[in-house]
Amino acid sequence: MSFLNAEEPNVVDLIVDFGLDLIWHPSLGLELGNNAQKLFWDCAKGERPLDIFVFEGTVIEAPDGTGRMDMFAGRPMKDWVTDLANAAQIVVAIGDCACFGGIPAMEPNPSGSTGLQFHKRQKGGFLGPDFTSRMGLPVINIPGCPAHPDWITQILVALATG
């Protein structure tokens, strides 16, 4: 959510000046319910290009590896993460939770929380140590609790413009 506080460049600059197509954001997305679900499925199936998949928050695998403790658009969030990460040209983890599992991953970790490509300091995490995006890159981590908003927008501009 710190992304919305970015100043240089701000969210409007990202869209207007740099041409980023913000497909969906929990605070800005107009699609809800079935419309949001269709949008995610279109991206996951490759029917809509997904250049940069940005994920914020920990991946929750409880209970018993099902991920059903964290449901979104009719499925466990972890299933969306798998499908969208595999469809994306670039995957970006924002914040300590997405990068490393954050505070929720501390023992005894009842939620089964982990980061995208790291679990705490150990390479691996939810997507595994060998994950690479369609562009051949590992997960790009922007740590912080929260991540600095300008780091987020500046890195997105750098990725989008090559």
Where would I find each of the regions flagged by the language model?
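Iron-sulfur-associated redox domains of electron-transfer enzymes in respiratory
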Residues: M1-G162
